[in-house]
C-alpha cells in the first residue's frame, strides 16, 4: 500500500474551530472571542492529545486571517524551563508590535507547567507589562502546577479526554480519505490504547496502515506495544486463582516475546483492576496498593523484571487471603 509520507496528525489537524473534535463547549466560548475580536489571556488544561494546541492555532487563524502566522508564535516550555526563556524569547516577542490589522499578537506556551517557579513569576510580570500588544495562551497537563497569580489572570479552559465515539468517528473519516479499511475490533482497540488521546489514536492508525491497508485489532495492539485486554484479564485471573507459575509464564510472554514495557503492563493492570465490577472492594484496594509499590520501586531504579515477578507474587498472596 502507498501510505502518505506526511505525518497524519499534522495532515488532518483541524484548520479552524469548526473542525475541532470533541470539545464543543470550549469551541463555542472561543468563537465568542473571534466575534468580538477581544481576547483575554487563556489557560488550557487537560491531558495530551485532546486539542489544546489545535484550538490555539485554530483560534489564531480565525482571529488574524492571512497574517496569523506572523502574529502567532508557539513555544514549548519543556525545551527550556528556566527564567532565560521568559527574559529572552518570550519578552522579545511580546514587546514588538503586531503586524497587519491585528491589534495584538498571541504567544502560545505549550507545557507551561514545566516552567520553574521563578520562570513563572517572570512570566506573570511579562503578561502584565505587555498585555496591550500580546495575549498569552498557556497550555498544561496539570493546572495545579501553574502559580495562582498566573491562573488569576487567565480565563481557564478544561479540556476533557475525548470520548470513544469522537475518536472512532475521526478515525473512520481519516481511513476513508486514505483508502484503508478497518475491522470493528480495530476501532475498539484504537479507543482502548488511545485513552481519549486523539494524537495517539491517529498515530496508531497510521502505524498499522503502513503494515497493511486492512487494519485489524491485532495490528493495533502490536504496533502500539499493548497487551490485549483479554490477556490482562487472564493474567490477573491466574494470579487470583493462585497459579503463580502460569501467571509468570504469561507475564514473560508479554514482556519478552511481545516487547511490552513493564510500566505499560502496570497501567493496563491498573485499568483492569479499577474498572472491575466483580472484584471485592478490599481486594481491589490491596491490588492497587501493590501496583503503586511496584511503580514506585521501578521509578527509583529497582530491577523491572524482579519487581514485576514480585508484583505477581503479591497479587497471588492477596487472592489467597
From Swiss-Prot:
ATP binds at residues 46-53. The keyword Coiled coil does not apply. Keywords: ATP-binding, DNA replication, Nucleotide-binding. One of its GO terms (cellular component) is DNA replication factor C complex. GO terms for molecular function: ATP binding; ATP hydrolysis activity; DNA binding; DNA clamp loader activity. The keyword Nucleotide-binding applies. GO terms for biological process: DNA repair; DNA-templated DNA replication. Heteromultimer composed of small subunits (RfcS) and large subunits (RfcL). Belongs to the activator 1 small subunits family. RfcS subfamily. Part of the RFC clamp loader complex which loads the PCNA sliding clamp onto DNA. This is Replication factor C small subunit. It comes from Methanocorpusculum labreanum (strain ATCC 43576 / DSM 4855 / Z). The gene is rfcS.
Amino acid at each position: 500500500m502507498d501510505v502518505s509520507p506526511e505525518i497524519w496528525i499534522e495532515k488532518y489537524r483541524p484548520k479552524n474551530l469548526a473542525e475541532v473534535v470533541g470539545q464543543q463547549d470550549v469551541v463555542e466560548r472561543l468563537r465568542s472571542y473571534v466575534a468580538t475580536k477581544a481576547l483575554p489571556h487563556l489557560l488550557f488544561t487537560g491531558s495530551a492529545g485532546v486539542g489544546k494546541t489545535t484550538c490555539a492555532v485554530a483560534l489564531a487563524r480565525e482571529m488574524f486571517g492571512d497574517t496569523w502566522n506572523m502574529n502567532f508564535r508557539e513555544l514549548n516550555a519543556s525545551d527550556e524551563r528556566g527564567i532565560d526563556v521568559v527574559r529572552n524569547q518570550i519578552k522579545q516577542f511580546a514587546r514588538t508590535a503586531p503586524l497587519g490589522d491585528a491589534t495584538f499578537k498571541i504567544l502560545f506556551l505549550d507545557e507551561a507547567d514545566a516552567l520553574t517557579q521563578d520562570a513563572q513569576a517572570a512570566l506573570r510580570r511579562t503578561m502584565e507589562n505587555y498585555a496591550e500588544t500580546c495575549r498569552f495562551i498557556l497550555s498544561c497537563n496539570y493546572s495545579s502546577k501553574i502559580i495562582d497569580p498566573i491562573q488569576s489572570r487567565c480565563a481557564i479552559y478544561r479540556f476533557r479526554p475525548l470520548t470513544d465515539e469522537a475518536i472512532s468517528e475521526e478515525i473512520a473519516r481519516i481511513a476513508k480519505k486514505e483508502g484503508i479499511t478497518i475491522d470493528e475490533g480495530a476501532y475498539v482497540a484504537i479507543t482502548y490504547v488511545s485513552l481519549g488521546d486523539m494524537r495517539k489514536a491517529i498515530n496508531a492508525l497510521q502505524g498499522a496502515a503502513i503494515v497493511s491497508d486492512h487494519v485489524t485489532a491485532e495490528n493495533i495492539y502490536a504496533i502500539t506495544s499493548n497487551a490485549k485486554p483479554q490477556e490482562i484479564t487472564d493474567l490477573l485471573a491466574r494470579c487470583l486463582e493462585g497459579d503463580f507459575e502460569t501467571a509468570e509464564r504469561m507475564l514473560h510472554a508479554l514482556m519478552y516475546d511481545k516487547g511490552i514495557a513493564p510500566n505499560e503492563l502496570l497501567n493496563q493492570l491498573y485499568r483492569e483492576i479499577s474498572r472491575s465490577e466483580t472484584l471485592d472492594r478490599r481486594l481491589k484496594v490491596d491490588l492497587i496498593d501493590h501496583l503503586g509499590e511496584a511503580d514506585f520501586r521501578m521509578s527509583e531504579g529497582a530491577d523491572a523484571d524482579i519487581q514485576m515477578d514480585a508484583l505477581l507474587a503479591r497479587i497471588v498472596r492477596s487472592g489467597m487471603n
